[in-house]
Amino acid sequence: MEAPGPAQAAAAESNSREVTEDAADWAPALCPSPEARSPEAPAYRLQDCDALVTMGTGTFGRVHLVKEKTAKHFFALKVMSIPDVIRRKQEQHVHNEKSVLKEVSHPFLIRLFWTWHEERFLYMLMEYVPGGELFSYLRNRGHFSSTTGLFYSAEIICAIEYLHSKEIVYRDLKPENILLDRDGHIKLTDFGFAKKLVDRTWTLCGTPEYLAPEVIQSKGHGRAVDWWALGILIFEMLSGFPPFFDDNPFGIYQKILAGKLYFPRHLDFHVKTGRMM
């Protein structure tokens, strides 16, 4: 199903009973009950934005680049099909992303400004990050220098430490989920797997190449999985490929559990001995 642009969605919004920051009548898992909050005027409205281009498509939605008509600010508008979200059982992931982003505020994390929904679509107005994905730069360059890898790693560490201070585990660190702003600094995005966590959880989620052994073995996992994923990311940034890869996920899992690393020759001594940081 094709997601509507802001112009079409604005018509639906003007006909709705009430426009608040979050509507609450379509899926309890995604929205709090009306009694849990007091109505308040929205900071943004769909009809106040012009759609410029579709920046990306996913399994149940699209991301549009939009511009606010009066202030001329640019935003990324994430439009998700509610029936597709429910059919693919992604309600919890959408809820996780929204609740986490509403709680956090950090220069290396994507910002969420506003959410709204009408009968068939859910909207998330987010910060526009013009530099694109770290993944694209890594594939174009092949691999990064130790200096570049150290720069990105330091900023990612700051972001992860902040999330952990809020008792939030990110659980989906990978090059595709790291955006670069106009000055080259990182922004973590896609918080669908993020979770508020005091102790441990047993959910199997994430990208196969980046899963920690305790996740694969269903032993319960906590914050340490983010640091494991950072190690995998550092290896991939400096070598051009992840340390454990195979044609199928089960082969990847076996190699992760075996724990054997093979370093490319071009990696310097400090990287191989873990003294890079």
UniProtKB/Swiss-Prot annotation:
The Gene Ontology biological process annotation of the record reads:
cell adhesion; protein phosphorylation; signal transduction
Supply one GO molecular-function term.
protein serine kinase activity
**Which catalytic residues are annotated?**
D172
Q: What is its EC number?
A: 2.7.11.1
Residues the entry annotates as binding ATP: M55, G56, T57, G58, T59, F60, G61, R62, V63, K78
In the record, which positions carry Phosphothreonine?
T203
One Gene Ontology cellular component annotation?
A: cAMP-dependent protein kinase complex
Q: In which tissues is it expressed?
A: Ubiquitous.
Keyword Phosphoprotein listed: yes
List the keywords (alphabetical): ATP-binding, Chromosomal rearrangement, Kinase, Nucleotide-binding, Phosphoprotein, Serine/threonine-protein kinase, Transferase
Please indicate if the UniProt record lists Phosphoprotein as a keyword: yes
**Record's InterPro entries?**
Kinase-like_dom_sf, Prot_kinase_dom, Ser/Thr_kinase_AS
Domain (Protein kinase) spans 49-277
Query: Where, if anywhere, are coiled coils annotated?
Result: none
Database matches in Gene3D superfamilies: Phosphorylase Kinase, domain 1 (3.30.200.20), Transferase(Phosphotransferase) domain 1 (1.10.510.10)
Q: Please give the residue ranges the record annotates as the region Disordered.
A: 1-40
Which reaction(s) are listed as its catalytic activity?
L-seryl-[protein] + ATP = O-phospho-L-seryl-[protein] + ADP + H(+); L-threonyl-[protein] + ATP = O-phospho-L-threonyl-[protein] + ADP + H(+)
Implicated disorder: A chromosomal aberration involving PRKY is a cause of sex reversal disorder. Translocation t(X;Y)(p22;p11) with PRKX. Chromosomal translocations proximal to PRKY account for about 30% of the cases of sex reversal disorder in XX males and XY females.
Name it: Putative serine/threonine-protein kinase PRKY
